């Protein structure tokens, strides 16, 4: 190359650490948005199932009236779903125990189907008493965890989510923020913890699968570079 010629300036590349952090942050935001909309969708679907039994977490006209007293329930469910879905893989990494049991999308879809089925059963099946109903739902919820999760961290988080969500829900009801459309409050209270537990396991599985897919994409990009 002649001395008079000058090299054209090349675009500066970010360091690998900055690039990695930026990529991870964007991926976390994308996963959070996806989980949020999944949570909103499931909240609306499950509410339609519960309408069959006249037991809903928000009035049936919530979509038609933006001034409904519980219009905020679906967004809250979406936010909780995003937090849970991001928390599960984070806890797995923190404990150094990556979840590898049934890590494919077909298993996740079956988990979602079983979760919806449990909710459908709670709306359709009649039991002699609330204790029998609660025991059946508890067995189904634990069966969902055993079939699609089997991790100690998943079970512990599921129990914690069920307890916290049930307490928050009852506090909102007691304070008159919103109320159930069914007069049988004991019936509602009997299935809430089981549904919250199964919902936590389901969203945790979705979050883990999204995180694993993200890791695969990042690994493929690093190999190409």
Swiss-Prot record:
There is a cross-link at residue 215 (Glycyl cysteine thioester (Cys-Gly) (interchain with G-Cter in ubiquitin)). One of its GO terms (molecular function) is protein sequestering activity. Expressed in liver, testis, kidney, spleen, intestine, brain and adrenal gland. GO terms for cellular component: SREBP-SCAP-Insig complex. The modification Cysteine sulfenic acid (-SOH) is found at residue 215. A motif (KxHxx) lies at residues 219-225. Pfam families: INSIG. Oxysterol-binding protein that mediates feedback control of cholesterol synthesis by controlling both endoplasmic reticulum to Golgi transport of SCAP and degradation of HMGCR. Acts as a negative regulator of cholesterol biosynthesis by mediating the retention of the SCAP-SREBP complex in the endoplasmic reticulum, thereby blocking the processing of sterol regulatory element-binding proteins (SREBPs) SREBF1/SREBP1 and SREBF2/SREBP2. The record marks 115 as: Required for the recognition of 25-hydroxycholesterol. It comes from the Eukaryota. It is a multi-pass membrane protein. Induction: Up-regulated in differentiating preadipocytes. Residues 1-28, 89-103, 149-153, 208-225 are cytoplasmic. Phosphorylation at Ser-151 by PCK1 reduces binding to oxysterol, disrupting the interaction between INSIG2 and SCAP, thereby promoting nuclear translocation of SREBP proteins (SREBF1/SREBP1 or SREBF2/SREBP2) and subsequent transcription of downstream lipogenesis-related genes. Polyubiquitinated by AMFR/gp78 at Cys-215 in some tissues such as adipose tissues, undifferentiated myoblasts and liver, leading to its degradation. In differentiated myotubes, Cys-215 oxidation prevents ubiquitination at the same site, resulting in protein stabilization. Interacts with SCAP; interaction is direct and only takes place in the presence of sterols; it prevents interaction between SCAP and the coat protein complex II (COPII). Associates with the SCAP-SREBP complex (composed of SCAP and SREBF1/SREBP1 or SREBF2/SREBP2); association is mediated via its interaction with SCAP and only takes place in the presence of sterols. Interacts with RNF139. Interacts with RNF145. Binds oxysterols in a pocket within their transmembrane domains and interacts with SCAP via transmembrane domains 3 and 4. This is Insulin-induced gene 2 protein. Residues 52-70, 127-129, 176-189 are lumenal.
